[in-house]
Each structure stands twice: as C-alpha cells, then as structure tokens.
C-alpha cells in the first residue's frame, strides 16, 4: 500500500522509533510546523513523526469525501509507524474528518478546532475567524465557540489565497499584504476584539496580520492550545516520554526537496525529508 524514497541524509537514527512511540503530527503542508514548534517548546522529550500531504495541497478547497480519504490513509500509515497519539495539525481535517476517524483507530486523535475555540472565548466577545474555504463552510469554529459561550458573536472569513501564498514563501510579498487587507476588512468593520487563526498555516502570517489589525485585537493560535491538550492527554494516559527524544522524522507525499527548503525558514534548520506514496489516497 505504501512505498517511500529518501531525500538526502541517513535515516538509521529512526531505527529505534518503535521502541520509543512517537506522536504523529500531520497537515497538508508546512502549516503544521506551527504545531511542531509548540511540541518542541511544551513537550521537548517527545519523539515526533511529521507528515505533510503536499501532493494534495491545499486541503481547504477539497470536498469532505476527499479530506476523509486522505486523512484515513495518513492515519493508516501512522498506525504502521506505531504512533501513540496523533495531532491533526490541520483545521480543515479537524473540521471535516475528526469525528469519523476517531471511531476507526485505537490511538488518541486530537484536533485543533476545539482547543482554539476554548481559547477564543477566554479572550473576547466579538470573535473573528479566518479559515480555509472548507473550514469556513463547515462552521466548525462558530459551532464550537457558540456551544462553549452562547453569548459571543462570531464572524468567519474564507481566505482561499493564504495557504498557496505561504507554501510559496510569499509572506513579505506586497500582494500578500493586499490580500490580507481584503480578508480582514469585514472583520475590522465588525469591531472584533479577537482573531482566531482558523488554519495552522496562518500564524506564519502573524507579522502581516498584526500590522493590519487594531492593537486591541487579540490573536489566538490554536496550535499553542492543542499541544497543551496533548500534554494533558499524555499525563492522563501515563504515556509521556521521559527519555531523550528521537530525531523528528519528516515525511511528505509530494516533493521532499521543496518541503525541506520551506522547513529551513520555519524551523531554523533543513530537515531530512522522506517521500511516502499513499497509493490508496484517491477519490473517484
């Protein structure tokens, strides 16, 4: 079902991975690196397997059936790697696939929407959410926020251009600023006091967004809060790693060289990247 090829480097260091079960983290691309950085910060002893489904990027324009199929294939692969827990470092898959796949796998699977919603209601009463088209259409954040705190107001904006611009490393492109202005304008008009990054890619745009928003608007990064929830789950299940972690393993379904180049900017080092073909990940 799966085959792989290696892009530069020696993966012998991963041979002991099964003796030290890892946390699996996946996203459509580099967005989930915001979650990975939080794991490094909050859970420095944990070994991690990161999967970027770059062959199917971006998820935000995909149908629910496509997302569900891709997520199942990724989780099957992670199951073969004997992970102890998985974080869906992707709001779109969290919104459209989490509840389905939680019933299908025997390891804990955490999504980013609920931790983000919980954090948002602690920050303000007029909450804006910027998200991919699929996440915005799902109303996942609005529903989660309203269930927690019914008296808040929520506005969502679909931002289809953000993920491609981030994946192309065009953060500081003047065009990106113009796009961001157009997405934020309706939220600023509503006088939001809180903005939720409804996509794990979006914290990469923090300098751009912060410069465009009123200073009183608080930014909520769900990656911070899903990793805090992960820490609680590890403690609850008594499965925290207390030894030194294994090197982070990176795998992608698309071009490993491109991901490695992006990783240098977001991680501060060039990761060794493995290409994995999820051959069953097709939807007719």
Model-derived segments and spans:
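Non-catalytic structural scaffold of enzyme domains
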Residues: 2-284
């Amino acid at each position: 079902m799966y085959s792989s090829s290696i892009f530069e480097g020696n993966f012998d260091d991963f041979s002991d991975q099964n003796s030290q079960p890892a946390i699996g983290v996946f996203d459509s691309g580099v967005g989930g690196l915001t979650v990975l950085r939080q794991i490094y910060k909050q859970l420095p002893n944990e070994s991690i397997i990161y999967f970027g489904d770059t062959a199917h990027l971006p998820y935000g324009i995909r149908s629910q059936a496509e997302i569900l199929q891709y997520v199942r294939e990724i989780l099957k692969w992670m199951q073969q790697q004997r992970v102890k827990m998985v974080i869906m470092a992707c709001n779109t898959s969290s919104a459209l696939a989490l509840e389905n796949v939680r019933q299908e796998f025997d390891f804990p699977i955490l999504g980013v929407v609920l931790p983000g919603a919980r954090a948002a209601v602690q920050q303000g009463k007029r909450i804006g959410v910027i998200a991919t088209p699929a996440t915005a259409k799902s109303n996942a954040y609005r529903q989660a926020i309203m269930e927690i705190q019914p008296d808040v107001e929520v506005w969502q904006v679909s931002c289809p251009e953000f993920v491609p611009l981030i994946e192309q490393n065009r953060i500081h492109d003047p065009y990106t600023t113009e796009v961001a202005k157009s997405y934020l304008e309706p939220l600023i008009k509503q006088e939001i006091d809180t903005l939720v990054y409804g996509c794990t890619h979006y914290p990469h745009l923090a300098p751009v967004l912060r410069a465009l928003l009123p200073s009183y608007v608080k930014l909520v990064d769900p990656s911070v809060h899903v990793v805090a929830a992960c820490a609680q789950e590890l403690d609850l299940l008594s499965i925290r790693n207390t030894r030194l972690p294994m090197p982070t393993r990176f795998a992608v379904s698309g071009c490993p060289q491109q991901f490695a180049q992006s990783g240098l900017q977001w991680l501060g080092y060039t990761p060794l990247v493995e290409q994995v073909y999820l051959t069953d990940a097709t939807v007719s």
